């Protein structure tokens, strides 16, 4: 498990920047999914349930002004930066694994 910091800038306005920290990369990726789900709930307040596919999630990520991760590396005792493409790849792997486990 590597401590992970998620940096989020929803719009071009720098005062909207925020961050969240997680105990692992997977927890962070789940946090990104939850952030999108909260966005969907705000956009559809009267909907009893929220459903989406991965392409919609990726479009949401692409529409953010900035989204990046800093992942702690114990070997160098530094944080390694990662961009949106890396985040989308990790989310894809996480969701595919969850779908496979649900199908068992």
Curated annotation (Swiss-Prot):
Gene3D superfamilies: Enhancer of rudimentary (3.30.2260.10). One of its GO terms (cellular component) is methylosome. It is found in: Nucleus. The modification Phosphothreonine is found at residue 11. Keywords: Acetylation, Cell cycle, Isopeptide bond, Nucleus, Phosphoprotein, Ubl conjugation. It comes from the Eukaryota. The modification N-acetylserine is found at residue 2. GO terms for biological process: nucleobase-containing compound metabolic process; pyrimidine nucleoside metabolic process. GO terms for molecular function: methyl-CpG binding; RNA binding. There is a cross-link at residue 12 (Glycyl lysine isopeptide (Lys-Gly) (interchain with G-Cter in SUMO2)). Transmembrane segments: none annotated. SUPFAM superfamilies: ERH-like. Expressed in all tissues examined. Belongs to the E(R) family. May have a role in the cell cycle. Homodimer. Interacts with POLDIP3. Component of the methylosome, a 20S complex containing at least CLNS1A/pICln, PRMT5/SKB1, WDR77/MEP50, PRMT1 and ERH. Interacts with CHTOP. This is Enhancer of rudimentary homolog. It comes from Homo sapiens (Human).
């Amino acid at each position: 498990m590597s401590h992970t910091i998620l940096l989020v800038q929803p719009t071009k306005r720098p005062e909207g920047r925020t961050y969240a920290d997680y105990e692992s990369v997977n927890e962070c990726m789940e946090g990104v999914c939850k952030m999108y789900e909260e966005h969907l709930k705000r956009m559809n307040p009267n909907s009893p349930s929220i459903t989406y596919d991965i392409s919609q999630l990726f479009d949401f990520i692409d529409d953010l002004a900035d989204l990046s991760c800093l992942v702690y590396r114990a070997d160098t005792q530094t944080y390694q930066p990662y961009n949106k493409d890396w985040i989308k790849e990790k989310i894809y792997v996480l969701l595919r694994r969850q779908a496979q486990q649900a199908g068992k």
